[in-house]
Amino acid sequence: MNGSTYAQNYEFSRIAIELALGRGGDQAVVKDNDKISYYGGKSQQMEKSTRVKARVKAHALREFIGSHEDVVIMGHKITDIDSFGAAVGVWRAARILDKKAHIVLGDINGSIRQWVNLFLNDKEYPEDMFVTHEQARKIVDHDTVVVVVDTNRPSMTECSEILNQTRTIVVLDHHRQSSEVIKNAVLSYIEPYASSACEMIAEILQYFADDIRLKGKEADCIYAGIIIDTNN
């Protein structure tokens, strides 16, 4: 409400609907310029994660990746194993479709360093599997698919600048949606009932392709993300 044009009011309404659905669907959300107000939602939410939803999202993800040549994947700043494992899972999905794929990494902290080294030291994996912020900015253009995992807030993404360089953004996350959203995502799968981003990716991979085969390192990363993030 209170937008300067009908088009802006429509955009406010669309964002409010996405927020309400992302927070469980039992709240009314009002967006008044930069102010977000929530009403209701006192009842406990019931688990809604279903195989049907995962299958639909998996097919949609396959369509978007399949229709583009380059895929860039990133998680959140200060990458943890859940974010990293989810990114690796999406990387494998892209490679199954013979697409160029890259994972954006900034500073590599101790919690994932050993995992990153497993791939860097394995000649089966391309040298450009991991790219820096600078490299990502050079790679991404309007025809690149940018997949964001384990966060739905633009300010928390590993390299937020590339969100403005593409027209095709996919968001896969298990955190509740806040008032800060990634705008213009062509596919948004936000499931607060999932224990981890890796759990969501594991479900998606089941339906992504019949012939998908994870290598041992990849499966270990995804499993570690599920175990550690669930315990946290």
Task: Give the ranges of each region predicted by the language model.
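Catalytic/regulatory signature loops of cyclic-dinucleotide turnover enzymes
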Residues: 11-37
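Internal hydrophobic scaffold segments of catalytic domains
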Residues: 7, 15, 19-22, 93-95, ...
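Short alpha-helical basic/polar micro-motif
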Residues: 10-11, 18, 88, 199
